[in-house]
Design a protein with these regions (language model features):
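N-terminal hydrophobic/helix-forming segments and targeting peptides
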Residues: 1-437
C-alpha cells in the first residue's frame, strides 16, 4: 500500500470485509502487518526502537498503530476514526415460536430502521470459545443468507407508506428459517469448533451486498458501513504514506469502537487507549513532563467521520450558506456547541495542508435550528489534550443499511491525509502555526 496509488477497489474490499467492528479491526491489522508493523499486546512488556513501526488492539474491535520518533520527541501527527456502524445486536442465539427459528435482536446505534427490511442478512462477530488452555476469540461471518427481517405487507398496514412508527421489539425481529436447525451449530461449524465449547459471543446482523460503483459515469459508490469505514481506510492509506523524515515526530493512526453508541467504552474514544499508548511511548523514550506537554502542543489530530451531503430531494435540510456536494472535497466541520473540535486555528492549518495537496475543502455546518450529531473528536480530546480538527466526507443516507458517497472524495481524503503526515507542524507560540509547506 505504501507508495502505491490509491485504489477504490481496495477501499471496496475494506468495506466488504468490515461486517462487524471485530472484522474491521482484523482487516486493518492485516494491512498493517503486511506493511511491517509489529503487534504489541497491551498485556505484554514493550521494547520500542527509534523509528519502529507498531500496533496494538483493544477488545479486538479497536486498533492503534504508530511510528516511533527517530530522535528526541518534538510533536505528534494523529488521525482517528471508528470501526463500528449502526446495526442489530443479537441478544441470544436461538428461539422458536412454533413456526419460525428466530434470534432476539436490539438496535445498536441510530440506524434507519426501514432500510433493514427484506434484505438477505448474515451474522457477523466473534465467538468466545473454550480451549484446552483457556478462552480464544474466533471471528465468524457465514457467506450466505441466514436471516431476513420481513416487512408487514401493505394489505395488513394500509398506512405503511404514510409514515410507520416502528417498534424494534415487534417489527424488527429477524427470522432464521423454519423450525429446527441451530444458529449456534451453524456458527460453530463456520469457526471449526464444537457448539458446546462456545461460551459467549458478540454478534450482529450484517448486510450481504458488496460495495459497488453507481452513476452514469461511475462517480459514486454504494455500500454498507461507509460511515465510518470510508474515513478509516482513507486515513489509514494516508498514514502509511508518511515518510517519517522528521526525527522527533511520532505518527499515530487509530480506529476506535462504539462511536455509534457514545464512545464511552474501554475501546471507545472516551476510553484510555490512545492516552495509554502515548504514555508508554513517552516512558520508553524517557520523556519528561515538560517535553510531553510541548510535544502535545506541537500536534494536530484529525478526527475523521463522515458528514451529510446536501440531499437532492431535501436541500432545505442543510445549511443554505454551506451546501455540501458529493465530489466537492473534504469536509471541515464546525459547530458552536463544540461537538466538533474545529476552530479557526486548527481549520486554517488543515486548509493550508489541503491546498498544498491540491484537495478542495468544503465547510460543513448544521442549520442554526438543527442541533446535528456529534462524533468522537471532542470526546477523545478529553483524554489527550491536543489541538484537533474534525473532518469527513459528504455522503447520502447516513445510517442506512446501504449508503452512498463519492469516489472522488475518497481519493481527496487519502491525498489530504498523506500530505498531512508529511507536513511538519509546530506552534512557535499560542495562536501561530509553523508548517513545513
Amino acid at each position: 500500500m505504501k507508495n502505491a496509488a490509491f485504489s477504490m477497489e481496495e477501499l471496496f474490499r475494506f468495506l466488504d470485509a468490515g461486517v462487524s467492528a471485530f472484522h474491521s479491526t482484523a482487516a486493518a491489522t492485516a494491512i498493517l502487518e503486511a506493511e511491517g508493523y509489529v503487534n504489541c499486546p497491551e498485556s505484554a512488556a514493550w521494547e520500542l526502537a527509534p523509528g519502529g513501526k507498531y500496533y496494538t488492539t483493544r477488545n479486538g474491535s479497536a486498533v492503534l498503530a504508530w511510528r516511533m520518533p527517530k530522535g528526541e520527541l518534538t510533536g505528534w501527527h494523529a488521525a482517528a476514526s471508528h470501526s463500528d456502524s449502526p446495526t442489530w445486536r443479537i441478544k441470544q442465539f436461538h428461539t422458536e415460536d412454533g413456526v419460525f427459528a428466530k434470534a432476539e435482536v436490539e438496535g445498536y446505534g441510530g440506524m434507519i430502521m426501514p432500510s433493514w427490511f427484506d434484505r438477505p442478512l448474515t451474522v457477523a462477530g466473534r465467538l468466545l470459545v473454550r480451549t484446552g488452555s483457556g478462552i480464544e476469540s474466533r471471528l465468524v461471518c457465514p457467506d450466505r443468507a441466514l436471516a431476513c427481517i420481513p416487512n408487514l405487507c401493505i394489505h395488513f398496514s394500509r398506512d405503511l407508506n404514510n409514515g410507520m412508527k416502528y417498534n424494534p421489539q415487534v417489527d424488527l425481529q429477524p427470522i432464521f428459517g423454519g423450525k429446527g436447525g441451530s444458529l449456534k451449530d451453524v456458527l460453530a461449524e463456520e469457526a471449526g469448533v464444537k457448539a458446546e465449547d462456545i461460551l459467549d459471543a458478540d454478534l450482529v446482523l450484517a448486510t450481504r451486498e458488496k460495495a459497488v460503483r453507481m452513476g452514469l459515469n461511475g462517480e459514486y459508490f454504494m455500500s454498507g458501513r461507509i460511515d465510518d469505514l470510508e474515513c478509516a481506510y482513507t486515513t489509514l492509506w494516508g498514514f502509511l504514506q508518511g515518510r517519517g523524515e522528521e526525527e522527533g515526530r511520532g505518527d499515530i493512526w487509530v480506529m476506535f469502537d462504539n462511536e455509534e453508541v457514545g464512545s464511552s467504552s474501554r475501546q471507545g474514544a472516551q476510553g484510555t487507549l490512545m492516552a495509554d499508548v502515548l504514555a508508554r511511548i513517552e516512558e520508553s523514550m524517557g520523556v519528561s513532563r515538560e517535553q510531553s506537554i510541548r510535544a502535545r502542543t506541537n500536534a494536530l489530530v484529525l478526527s475523521a467521520d463522515n458528514g451529510h451531503a446536501t440531499h437532492p430531494n431535501h436541500p432545505e435540510k442543510s445549511d443554505p450558506a454551506n451546501p455540501v456536494v458529493m465530489g466537492g472535497g473534504v469536509l471541515l466541520k464546525y459547530n458552536a456547541r463544540q461537538t466538533y473540535t474545529t476552530s479557526g486555528f486548527t481549520g486554517a492549518a488543515f486548509t493550508a495542508i489541503c491546498k498544498k495537496a491540491g484537495v478542495p475543502v468544503q465547510v460543513f455546518a448544521n442549520r442554526a435550528d438543527v442541533p446535528g450529531g456529534s462524533t468522537l473528536g471532542n470526546l477523545l480530546g478529553h483524554q489527550i489534550l491536543m489541538p484537533m480538527v474534525d473532518i469527513g466526507l459528504g455522503q447520502l443516507a447516513m445510517h442506512s443499511a446501504m449508503e452512498t458517497a463519492s469516489c472522488a472524495d475518497a481519493e481527496y481524503m487519502a491525498k489530504a491525509v498523506a500530505e498531512y503526515y508529511n507536513t511538519p507542524i509546530f506552534q512557535p507560540k499560542d495562536g501561530e502555526w509553523k508548517l513545513g509547506l
